[in-house]
Amino acid sequence: MTPLVVLLRRTPAVALFTLGHVTVFTIVGLVRDQSFLWVYLPALAASIAIVVWIDHRWGPIPVVLLWLLSIWAGMHLAGGLAPDPSGQKDILYGWWLIDGYLRWDHLVHGFGIGAATAVLAFAARDSDRPLIWGFVLAQVVGVVNETAENIVALFVEGSNVGDAVNTAWDIIWHLVGALVAVIWMTQRGIPGTEFGRAGRLDLEGEIL
């Protein structure tokens, strides 16, 4: 069996949930004529391929972390394709959850990079400093995402990608999400490892 089939057979609920929200938000994007849909779908396919590779090479990735990744994907698709319920912006990413302080955009970036930090720390669990590796690699994921979005925005009219200030806030929330994940794993352990329930880790991976 291929690595993708192995992963799908191991986590059918996550696969169905992912298929469901991808289908829903694809329809939403088509109905609303959101051109960025044709950027999101290939990016999502590439992201799934990376997850499958990590699962095959360093897995199996714990199901709870796969759920977090799927939820992040759904939040991201909703943010770029669904409308802002307040009517102030064209897409959900512009929706202020707490006026002047927290937008949907901030929440998605923080949650997503936090989830990526946990997955990458799990992948680096056999290294001397898994939490540091998870933190650093997750920031790389964030930078790649921001770079790709801004490059594509140069060629896609009406992409709704923000300006430099928005990008700076995205990076700040990447740091916040990763720090929250690292602090949580410092106290509770890396999910899916032998210390995930039985002990805590310091930043260098030593048992406390």
Task: State each model region's role.
Residues 163-180:
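Membrane-interface transmembrane-helix boundary segments in multi-pass integral membrane proteins
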Residues 1-161, 183-208:
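Bulky hydrophobic segments
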